[in-house]
């Protein structure tokens, strides 16, 4: 049974939410077709004290979404070319989020060409991994139009064909023994203590069933 995750799920300690997001489904409706994939890799960013977090230097115009209610999208641009997708966690006023780094496309995903939902030629992509946050946002056609929006099926674009973006629980529970953890990627600027925190969680492709 499919169940859309609501604010209550995300309004909990960030590391707990992060681990429980593994095995959940990221779902998007693009050009009338629903595309989806199992979340296989994430990173947690938790509070002012986390030197790897955008919020470590306080609230700004760029990161203000992190301080908002749980269950909303925080999307930002990096390296002048990539959008990065995060979901807000914890209570309002406490800046925390989970970054979605990897997705495994599954059965039921619309057959799309070369990772482009708007392509004219279709090929089956079930089982293809999207590794890296830039690949996830490119394939799912995610940009700053969704920044600050609630994670649900409602489209923020009115009558446009692009729909919402949400996360579903489809009853899959990843055993604790299958969840791997490591330091987050590319956060050396946070210093040795915070760069070394094991706040990256992932499952291997063979365990994404």
Q: Which residue stretches match the model-derived regions?
A:
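Short polybasic linear motifs
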Residues: 116, 120
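Conserved, well-structured core segments that form or line functional sites
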Residues: 2-112, 122-156, 162-209
């Amino acid at each position: 049974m499919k169940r859309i995750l609501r604010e209550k799920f995300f309004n909990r300690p960030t590391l707990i939410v992060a681990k429980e997001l593994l095995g959940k489904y990221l779902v998007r409706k693009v050009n009338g077709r629903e595309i989806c994939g199992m979340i296989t890799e994430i990173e947690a960013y938790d509070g002012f004290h986390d030197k790897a977090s955008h919020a470590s230097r306080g609230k700004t115009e760029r990161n203000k979404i992190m301080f908002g209610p749980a269950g909303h999208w925080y999307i930002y641009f990096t390296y002048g070319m990539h959008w990065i997708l995060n979901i807000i966690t914890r209570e309002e006023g406490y800046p925390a989020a989970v970054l979605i780094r990897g997705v495994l496309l599954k059965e039921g995903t619309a057959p799309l060409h070369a990772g482009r939902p708007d392509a004219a030629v279709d090929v089956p992509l079930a089982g293809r991994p999207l590794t890296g946050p830039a690949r996830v946002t490119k394939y799912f056609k995610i940009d700053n139009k969704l920044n600050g929006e609630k994670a649900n099926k409602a489209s923020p674009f009115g009558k446009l064909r692009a729909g919402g973006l949400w996360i579903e629980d489809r009853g899959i529970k990843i055993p604790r023994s299958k969840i791997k953890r490591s330091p987050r990627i590319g956060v050396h600027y946070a210093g040795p203590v915070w760069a070394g925190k094991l706040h990256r969680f992932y499952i291997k492709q063979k365990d994404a069933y």
